[in-house]
């Protein structure tokens, strides 16, 4: 494989592509340029979710970093498959465990992972594929809306509101923006992790359909 540089471009319409928990879940922005931001962590999460949904039960396409995963348990799978004691990780066990994890987990051989845990140590993997933050082409304006819910959570809330049973909330969206992120694939690291041409095609498919299964009230168009 040769080195690949690529761009991921997507647009956002009346959606919040990546809320900032430090700012009340408002869309992330660069405080100097006021351009919208989507973190690389957010983009990788969507790629992982797509692979997990579309490659379920396909050998070699398991996902290491997934919701509610217990990472030690995932690494114990490697030790058990190789006949090692997870409580006695040595250099031999670590190196063999790292290769097993790369072979079986798509996101490890793609993005890398730190697996240097005390138990079932599988070392570290530097991934061949790296993504930048996505940044909007122009500065964005965050629209804020007040929303109401015609119900309350507890009887006490109902009593406090004298039966009105309404709760208020806020919702933030980006009216419209085009975002772009830069990425690269390092062929030398790909050789080390076993990242293949087929893996690259799978990654491209995931990026093309990044938001297909990501629609929600905050992202009605999936973006």
PLM feature spans:
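RNA-binding basic/glycine-rich loop and surface signature characteristic of RAMP-family CRISPR effectors
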Residues: 1-223
